[in-house]
Swiss-Prot record:
Organism whose genome encodes this protein: Bradyrhizobium sp. (strain BTAi1 / ATCC BAA-1182)
InterPro entries given in the database record: AAA+_ATPase, ATP-synt_VA_C, ATP_synth_F1_bsu, ATPase_a/bsu_AS, ATPase_alpha/beta_chains, ATPase_F1/V1/A1_a/bsu_N, ATPase_F1/V1/A1_a/bsu_N_sf, ATPase_F1/V1/A1_a/bsu_nucl-bd
Name listed for the protein in its UniProt record: ATP synthase subunit beta 1
Enzyme class: translocase
Keyword annotations from UniProtKB, A to Z: ATP synthesis, ATP-binding, Cell inner membrane, Cell membrane, CF(1), Hydrogen ion transport, Ion transport, Membrane, Nucleotide-binding, Translocase, Transport
Length: 480
């Protein structure tokens, strides 16, 4: 066992984010956290390799400028530990659990190591259950599994962040669950904007001047683009550790990762720094193992669930690139946001034909839901096929049957839009949470032609089908 004296080592070499530390007689275990001071600040190093009998190679969690050879380093005897519990809600912490929102220390229930084993088979729940999000297009066509993993694809400016905010808001309201947002290697400006948007849209309370009527629903963990690769490779684990603690206390937790590609990218940088031989396209040889170690911890246990929504950047739009291809293997559902739908003013801009889910099976969602979803996709697919003809020859050249299909498809498309709670402050229209039964009923009536008499505009930005009928009456009265 290590005594206090031999828990102290000395730095022998610093190469960028890699620091070698020599210990006499006792070597810290792999993944142990070592601490030193750099310009008065705490610097955490994580043991990655043992070199020879007395030296460990570590990855720094912050910048290493200013470190000198011979400097003392202390072995903490445990992996990196971060604060967990309700004290983290509404706060921003970094990879090592320090608050970075200038609102004082985090009031944590306890500390928990960021490296944990995935739950054993006996602890996992095997029931296939749907997480109702209250967002019509998602619940109908690509339903999320409780404890599942969802990939969120979308370019810049199509509404990824607003969709994420609405999911956080709805899960908190409908399921009483908390959320954890891990910003992995993305822009610091976006992280800052997100933090302030969460406060404005009442997802979180402002820690600087708290409003007693607002309860924070989301913890934020950031390791942004400017951080060294060590921090970016570990920040997703820090966020996951906070989520696991909520889950073990019986919560249904939402865990957001933006962006899962940056986790792989940081892993590849660390791997190169450690001198490992790269594999395909320059990625780390342990790519699948690293991804598996993270993803296998995201699951439903007998106590609670972690449902994860992961934004996935696809480098050069190449879906066969090893990084996105490895993450696809773990996904239960994909939600694809489309620019062409956003251009029509239909929000959320979810592509109904490109979004998929493993849960959309009659055995899980039931015969009626499955049949309605497939009919909706059929109508939209037919409309898509007819668009070229409409563009060249116009609507008049279509058969009566096709005209009816187009009219219904356009109504279905508009009915997929809905006002969001988190966008109320911008749009002025109150947000809507639509129950699954109402969603199925509405779309079923639409594809069966029950609402053929209503104008298209009646279906735009409403919640349930009853609201669309009301809006239709109002529009008719105004026109009369």
């Amino acid at each position: 066992m290590a005594t206090a004296a031999n828990q102290i080592g000395r730095i022998t070499q610093v190469i960028g984010a890699v620091v070698d530390v020599q210990f006499e007689g006792h070597l810290p275990a792999i993944l142990n956290s070592l601490e030193t001071k750099n310009a008065g600040n705490r610097l955490v190093l994580e043991v990655a390799q043992h070199l020879g009998e007395s030296t460990v190679r570590t990855i720094a969690m912050d910048t290493t400028e200013g470190l000198v050879r011979g400097q003392e380093v202390t072995d903490t005897g445990a992996p990196i530990r971060v604060p967990v519990g309700e004290g983290t809600l509404g706060r921003i912490i970094n990879v090592i659990g320090e608050p970075i929102d200038e609102a004082g220390p985090v009031k944590a229930d306890s500390l928990r190591a960021i490296h944990q084993e995935a739950p054993s088979y006996t602890d996992q729940s095997t029931e296939a259950e749907i997480l109702v999000t209250g967002i019509k297009v998602v619940d109908l066509l690509a339903p999320y599994a409780k404890g599942g993993k969802i990939g969120l694809f979308g370019g810049a400016g199509v509404g990824k962040t607003v969709l994420i905010q609405e999911l956080i808001n709805n899960v908190a309201k409908a399921h009483g669950g908390y959320s954890v947002f891990a910003g992995v290697g993305e822009r610091t400006r976006e992280g800052n904007d997100l933090y302030h948007e969460f406060i404005e849209s009442k997802v979180n309370a402002d820690p600087h001047n708290p409003d007693p009527s607002v309860k924070s629903k989301c913890a934020l963990v950031f390791g942004q683009m400017n951080e060294p690769p060590g921090a970016r490779a570990r920040v997703a684990l820090t966020g996951l550790t906070i989520a696991e603690d909520f889950r073990d206390k019986g919560q249904d937790v939402l865990f957001f990762v933006d962006n899962i590609f940056r986790f792989t990218q940081a892993g590849s940088e660390v791997s190169a720094l450690l001198g490992r031989i790269p594999s395909a396209v320059g990625y780390q040889p342990t790519l699948a193992t690293d991804m598996g170690a993270l993803q296998e911890r995201i699951t439903t246990t007998t106590k609670g669930s972690i449902t994860s929504v992961q934004a996935i950047y696809v480098p050069a739009d190449d879906l066969t690139d090893p990084a996105p291809a490895t993450s696809f293997a773990h996904l239960d559902a994909t939600t694809t946001l489309s620019r062409s739908i956003a251009e029509k003013g239909i929000y959320p801009a979810v592509d109904p034909l490109d979004s998929t889910s493993r849960m959309l099976s009659p055995l899980v969602v039931g015969e009626e839901h499955y049949a309605v979803a497939r009919q909706v996709q059929q109508v939209l697919q037919r409309y898509k096929a007819l668009q070229d003809i409409i563009a060249i020859l116009g609507m008049d050249e279509l058969s009566e049957e096709d005209k009816l299909t187009v009219a219904r498809a356009r109504k279905v498309e508009r009915f997929m839009s809905q006002p969001f709670h988190v966008a109320e402050i911008f749009t002025g229209s109150p947000g809507k949470f639509v129950e699954l039964a109402d969603t199925i009923k509405g779309f079923k009536g639409l594809v069966e032609g029950k609402y053929d008499h209503l104008p298209e505009a009646a279906f735009y930005m409403v919640g349930t089908i009853e609201e669309a009928v009301e809006k239709g009456k109002k529009l008719a009265a105004e026109a009369a």
